[in-house]
Structure formats: C-alpha cells, structure tokens
Amino acid sequence: MDTAKVEPPQETKKTILTAQTPLSMSISSLPDEIVLSFLALISKSYYRSLSLVSKSFYSLLSSTEIYAARSHIGATEPCPYVCLWLPKKHRWFTLAEIEGKLSLEPVRLSSSYPRTRVNSTTVAAGTEIYKIGGTVKGKRSRAVFVLDCWTHRWRRAPNMRVSRVGAKSCFLDGNIYVIGGCRKSEEESMNCGEVFDLKTQTWNPLPSPSVNYAVHSNHKVAVSGERLYVITKRNNYAYDPNEGRWLPDVGSVDLQPITGPWSGGIEKVMKPITGRPWKYTWYSSSHRAWQRVMGLDVLYDKRGCGYRTIQLVNYGGKLLIIWSEWIMILDGYSLIRSQEKEIWCAVIRLEERMSYFGPQIWGEVESCNVVVPSVPKSYQLSSCQCVSV
C-alpha cells in the first residue's frame, strides 16, 4: 500500500516589532504633520514612553508644535506641576496617571532655574506658572519668573511695583492678583495689592479695601465665582473686577476654612473644600453650609495615623489630594517614627446626588498610592499648580 509522504509542520516565526520593522518604518516615513496629528490625540501621560521609540518621536513630543496641535483640536488635559523643596534645591515634577496608577515624573527644565526664592507665591495662568516675589539671600524681591509648560523654559516677566514676601496670589479673568507681603508702610497705601494684566504685561495697583485695612502674614486669598476674596484676622473682603470695587465685610459665612489653593468643581461651579482632622467636607454656596463628603471610606482606611494633608487642588473638575505620612520602623516590639516621610496622592471624582435629606456630595476614589517613597522630614511642598496642556 502506497503511503503518502507527510511533510513536517513548518515552524511559525514570530514577528517582533522593533525600530526596524516595516510598521515602524512606515510611520516614520509619514510627514511630520500627520504623525503630529496622531500623537496629539494620545494622553500626555504616555509621552514619556513614546519618546523612547525613536529620535523623531522624541523630537516631536518635545516640541511646542505638539501642544499647539493639542490645543487646536481641543485635546488638552489638566496636568498638575508639583514643586518639592528638597535639601538645598527645588525639584519640579508632573503628576502622571496611567491605568489608575499615579506617579511623579521629573521635569527636565530647558533653562536654568531662577535663584531659590523663599516665601514666594506661585500661581498658574493658562499654560504657564508664575513665581512671584520672595527673598533672595534675605533681600525682598520684586522679580517675577514664568515657567512655560510647553517648553519647560524659564523667562523673566515685568517686575512688580513693590517687593513682596509671603504674598498670596490667584488668577481671575485674565489677570493675576497679588495681595499682601509688603511692608506695613506700604499696606496703607495703594500698594497693598497689585494686578498683572496678561495681555498688556503691565502691573497696576489694587487699592486698599478700607482705611483700617491691614494684611497679616497669615492672610488668605480665594476665588469663588467671579469674585476675589481676602480673609484677614479681623475682616473678610470681596473684590468684584467687573465693578472695580471692594465689598466690605462679606464674612457672614465662615470663609476661613475655604481659602487657600484647594478648591473643587462640579458642573464648572467653584465650591471650595476643606480638610477636617479625619474627614473632608464640602462647602455648598447655595445652602451656605458645610456638608460631609460621602463615600471616602476607602481613602480614610488607606491613611496612617501620622498623616498630614498638604494640599487639595482642582484637577480638571476632580479633586487631587496630596498628603505625607511618617515612615514607621520596628524598634523591638513597637513602631516608631523614622526620620523620613512618604508622599501620597489621591484623585477623587465628585458628584452631587439627591437623597431623602436633600442633595449630598459623594466622592469616588479613582486613584490612590504612594508617589514618593522616601523624602527627608525637612522637605516641603513648595507649590502644586494645575495647568492645561
């Protein structure tokens, strides 16, 4: 009987994509304009990995054209910039969020960082971060430096009219407001505050709210709606830019807990939020009352007993919480504090729900993990600003 010759099965070769594969080469052969349009649609969190694919990718992802393209097609996204004061120097990071995991990525500055300034004030405006005033070697400064978050280059901006230390700042309707931080003799004059017009690049004086107005070192500044609020030990004031005047004694509601860099937003309405010793509460401007944020038990369970909330930041309508905890070490049969801390971040999505008792604010923990495993106990969070890039 004839037997058919059976051919042995052929080995299937696996194709491994490398920088030299036809697919990669075909992408590289496309015009930069087309590649740029594709890359602009991808989340910025992946740019660090994509820049390792090829030199052309690195060049495109490092250019200003990629951010211009993202802005043109409406693909911008919020990006928090965190500045940590580590021993003898400042370090800038961006907060990346990939597949529910948060991480701090070092920023490669394209230009030298300005001299270390103690007690300066920092504020985000558009795609830029302004660092204003402070002291250099014990001397007060009027200097203003701007970090372009597209190019990561520092540049000088026009100096303030008055040198300021420990001032507070905020961004409202195309202007940067800087309050306080000047000498007492200047607080009583037209120099208690200044306004920087981004279009004209000029500083203008902001008049004093009242004759007896005095700014203390712990004064606070907040933006709610279309008004600027200044809170001092004695009085609270609101400034209406549209009317160009101060509204005195607006403190019928306790504004002290709602001021600072922390604020959240629901349906584009800014409603400040504050941290209590163990829980977080939300201030409802419509009800003029504080409400406990529900649904955050997962967050509370993760925090240790030695935590300290550093900052709460509006993160594109979500709430970014940054805090530090002592690293505990085992000493015999007990836990003691080490000389180092770890930094945590959490992203909370907030929404308003109706209940039998009325509207409630609920939070859902989207991400929560350690972003810096170890820092010296002397570290400080110099600033956290969220820009749109």
Swiss-Prot record:
Note the InterPro entries from the entry: F-box/kelch-repeat_ARATH, F-box_dom, Kelch-typ_b-propeller, Kelch_1
Looking at the keywords, is Nucleotidyltransferase present?
no
Q: Which domain of life is it from?
A: Eukaryota
**Pfam families per record:** F-box (PF00646), Kelch_FKB95 (PF25210)
Kelch repeat segments = 128-174, 176-225, 227-273
The region annotated as signal peptide is: none
**Domain called F-box: residue spans:** 24-70
Q: Which UniProt keywords apply?
A: Kelch repeat, Repeat
Which SUPFAM superfamilies did the record assign?
Kelch motif (SSF117281)
Presence of keyword Membrane? no
Instruction: Tell me what this protein is called.
Output: Putative F-box/kelch-repeat protein At4g35120
**Source organism:** Arabidopsis thaliana (Mouse-ear cress)
